[in-house]
Amino acid sequence: MSDPRKESLIVERFEMRASTEPKEGELELYSLFSIIFGFLGIMLKYKICLWVSAVCCVAYLSNLKSKDSSVRTILSPVSLSLMGLVMAYFGPNSNLFV
């Protein structure tokens, strides 16, 4: 039996996979942006800053590894973004938020 394929036309292909690992400083940036936008949203009374803070917080929590987790590093951005959103929508001065 002869093989009908021509060896000169065979091209080996390697599957390229995108790395799903976050870069080294990416997690800290998500946490930092969450805290910064949370403070800006509370101090300047901007709801959009509070929502950006919440999105950065969710991105931070979704990429967090168990070895990186400590209570303080998790609780700071989460509490600040949630506190800002609660103040913006349910607080006594919620009409002042833009």
From Swiss-Prot:
InterPro entries: ASTER (IPR005351). One of its GO terms (molecular function) is protein folding chaperone. Pfam families: ASTER. GO terms for cellular component: endoplasmic reticulum membrane. It is a multi-pass membrane protein. GO terms for biological process: protein insertion into ER membrane. The chain crosses the membrane at residues 32-52, 78-98. It is found in: Membrane. Belongs to the Asterix family. This is Protein Asterix. It comes from Dictyostelium discoideum. The lineage of its organism: Eukaryota, Amoebozoa, Evosea, Eumycetozoa, Dictyostelia.
